[in-house]
């Protein structure tokens, strides 16, 4: 069964959250817990692209986020959920062929799903300034 891109982004978010909480964790083990056995290779390929891409470009992505934070704010003050959602969106905007508007919309939807009511507005504001 093929997953939607939104579902793949949700799994990427959950994987990155788990890896951030436990650096010794293995992304493949997390995938096995989150994915059905009958997912196709293109799903796994895009999931790997997102997770590995965010991890590989994390320092550059974090520098982008920092540019749009208020004075006296740093990346460490951000809610972990919002930070991971921003990292996924910025990876898609900067390093993949996903249209910026789609990446922003998907990030806002993830924030609505996984964070509080104010977070989606914050995520949207940061990403709108970036694009």
Curated annotation (Swiss-Prot):
One GO term (biological process): transcription antitermination
Q: Does the keyword RNA-binding apply?
A: yes
Q: Which UniProt keywords apply?
A: RNA-binding, Transcription, Transcription antitermination, Transcription regulation
**Statement: the UniProt record of this protein carries the keyword Transcription:** yes
Tell me the GO molecular function terms: RNA binding
Looking up Gene3D superfamilies in the UniProt record yields:
NusB-like
Cellular component GO terms held in the UniProt record: cytosol
PANTHER family reported in the protein's UniProt record: ANTITERMINATION NUSB DOMAIN-CONTAINING PROTEIN (PTHR11078:SF3), N UTILIZATION SUBSTANCE PROTEIN B-RELATED (PTHR11078)
What this protein is reported to do is described as: Involved in transcription antitermination. Required for transcription of ribosomal RNA (rRNA) genes. Binds specifically to the boxA antiterminator sequence of the ribosomal RNA (rrn) operons.
What NCBIfam families has UniProt attached to this entry? nusB, PRK00202.1-1
Q: Which HAMAP family match?
A: NusB
Family, per entry? Belongs to the NusB family.
* Protein known as: Transcription antitermination protein NusB
Annotated source species: Ligilactobacillus salivarius (strain UCC118) (Lactobacillus salivarius)
**Taxonomy-wise, where does this protein's organism fall, top ranks first?**
Bacteria, Bacillati, Bacillota, Bacilli, Lactobacillales
């Amino acid at each position: 069964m093929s997953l939607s891109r939104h579902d793949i982004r949700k799994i990427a978010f959950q994987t990155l959250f788990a890896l951030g909480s436990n650096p010794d964790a293995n992304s493949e083990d997390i995938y096995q817990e989150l994915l059905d056995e009958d997912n196709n290779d293109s799903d796994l390929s895009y999931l790997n692209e997102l997770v590995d891409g965010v991890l590989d470009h994390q320092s550059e992505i974090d520098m982008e986020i920092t540019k749009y934070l208020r004075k006296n704010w740093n990346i460490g003050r951000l809610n972990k959920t919002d930070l991971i959602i921003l990292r996924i969106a910025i990876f898609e905007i900067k390093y993949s062929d996903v249209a910026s508007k789609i990446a922003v919309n998907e990030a806002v939807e993830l924030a609505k799903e996984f964070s509080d009511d104010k977070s989606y507005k914050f995520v949207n504001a940061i990403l709108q300034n970036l694009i």
